[in-house]
């Protein structure tokens, strides 16, 4: 009888501790990740020229160019910062994002795609319109699952 009680206590302890540990996990790594960079224009930038670049060059070339990533420049039309710009990078999952950009640096695989499709030149051209800070400051939002 005592042996059964000990086994029951051990199982109960494992259940409680396991449930507590699992309840602290807020994401599985499988939910989408939305990386947001709020783009701040450099001084004396022609906004219509920037928007033309965004539509005709950046967005059209980045459109599904990298598997698992949807990336584009957008403009706010409602809310607290109307007429502001942001770059959205929507990764299929946190796992995909971490594979592409481990430790805040592009992977060799991602660099190869960026070079083959000449996407780095577009990224560099984007930096002629927006401040360096707006390209390096971002938030990644992970879908809770």
Question: What are the functions of these language-model segments?
Answer:
Residues 1-8:
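Bacterial N-terminal signal peptides that target proteins for export
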Residues 8-18:
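Bacterial N-terminal signal peptides
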Residues 16-28:
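Bacterial Sec-dependent signal peptides at the C-terminal "C-region" and cleavage site
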Residues 23-25, 59-92:
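Short, glycine- and small/hydrophobic-rich beta-strand elements in well-ordered beta-sheets
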Residues 30-40, 86:
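Active-site-flanking beta-strand signature of metal-NTP-handling nucleotidyl enzymes
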Residues 38-44, 89-93:
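Short beta-strand-to-loop capping motifs
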Residues 41-53:
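Short, surface-exposed ligand-recognition loops at beta-strand->loop->(often short) alpha-helix junctions
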Residues 61-70, 90-137, 144-145:
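An amphipathic, aromatic/His-enriched active-site/gating alpha helix that lines ligand/cofactor pockets
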